Amino acid sequence: LVASQVVMAPIHLLAAGGSVGRRLGAVGGGLVVNSGQWDGYPDERERLLGLLARRPGGALVLSGDLHSSWVSQLATEDGRGAPVAAEFTVPAVSAPTFARALAPKVWGGRSVLERAIRRANPHVAWVDTAAHGYLLLDVTAERVEGRWWHVDRVGKRTDAERLAATWSVTRGDPRPFDGPAES
């Protein structure tokens, strides 16, 4: 397990293209949009992923700071190389979400934003840009299972929550898969 305060997976919004990319503030020439994440440190990310690639058994990176829920596949060569780790990104508990910040700038809102993210980032297996919540991990020697629990309201006391997704990764295979791992 590797903990990272910020998201390690490359996030390409430039490739989202057209009006979506422009409305999100994308710039041309390959400049990164999200330079406060690992995207701003591509050489360092490549070195770390290279180290993870040399360790047998795969790895799982836990990250945050995007205020949304993501499951990504990490690979060397800016995502074009062999898979070396999965990444589980936790949502915000109460801070404004990724969708709240960006979806109003996109015609069609959240659903168009999430489709554009997935289209431009094939290494992103799942994303929910709008929900608040938390991630609950179940870790054994053979697998890690993550359950994203989301809440519909913040700012008002309630114990209502819902299971939004379950993703897992098993020892020896760095690719995340949808659903619980077999014990």
Which functions belong to the PLM regions below?
Residues L1-S183:
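Long, structured stretches of catalytic cores involved in phosphate-ester chemistry, encompassing
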